[in-house]
Amino acid sequence: MSRVAKAPVALPNGVSVTLNGQQVEVKGSKGTMSLHLHDLVELKQEDSQLILSPVSDSKEAWMHTGTMRSTLNNFVIGVSEGFERKLQLIGVGYRAQVAGNKITLNVGYSHPVEYILPEGVTAETPSQTEIILKSNDKQALGQAAAKIRGYRPPEPYKGKGIRYSDEHVVRKEAKKK
């Protein structure tokens, strides 16, 4: 039995949920997101809470209910507050520029690396070595941040590379003669 699935999803002011069969639409100040509920999951709205419950008492139904509850909670947070992910570029000559929906990275290759942001994700660079990604879709934001980090992941000896701002890179000692 999923402990996550038992907790209701709180709806803050300004967020509305529309149910149309198994299709759920969440509207807020930052946009609209929709989700198709799994067939083993039921959704009820009571006051300012969403309560999810499994159709049957099987392990699979509880599993899907927990997943749907987490996804709906992320949608509610996304359309009301939004999500943000910060990346740091550490290394000599490592720079980033944003132009529209394209990020140009100079990260030690012989050519600049260009990354086109997915729809719904925006980027800004307060400095040349910092990238801030914002979106109301947590999944797309995390995917974009992971792709950018993947161009030059932090290496363990000097710590150079692209890292999340809250990431701790475990450093290794150089080989001794």
From Swiss-Prot:
User: What GO molecular functions are on record for this protein?
Assistant: rRNA binding; structural constituent of ribosome
Q: Where is the composition biased (Basic and acidic residues)?
A: 155-177
Judging by the UniProt lineage, the source's domain of life is Bacteria
The protein's UniProt keywords, in alphabetical order, are:
Ribonucleoprotein, Ribosomal protein, RNA-binding, rRNA-binding
Give each disulfide bond as a residue pair.
Answer: none
One Pfam family assigned to this protein is Ribosomal_L6
Question: Per the record, GO CC terms?
Answer: cytosolic large ribosomal subunit
Alphabetically, which GO biological process terms does the record hold? Answer: cytoplasmic translation
User: What does the sequence similarity comment in the record state about its family?
Assistant: Belongs to the universal ribosomal protein uL6 family.
Function as written in the Swiss-Prot or TrEMBL entry: This protein binds to the 23S rRNA, and is important in its secondary structure. It is located near the subunit interface in the base of the L7/L12 stalk, and near the tRNA binding site of the peptidyltransferase center.
Cross-referenced NCBIfam families: L6_bact
Q: Mind telling me what this protein is named?
A: Large ribosomal subunit protein uL6
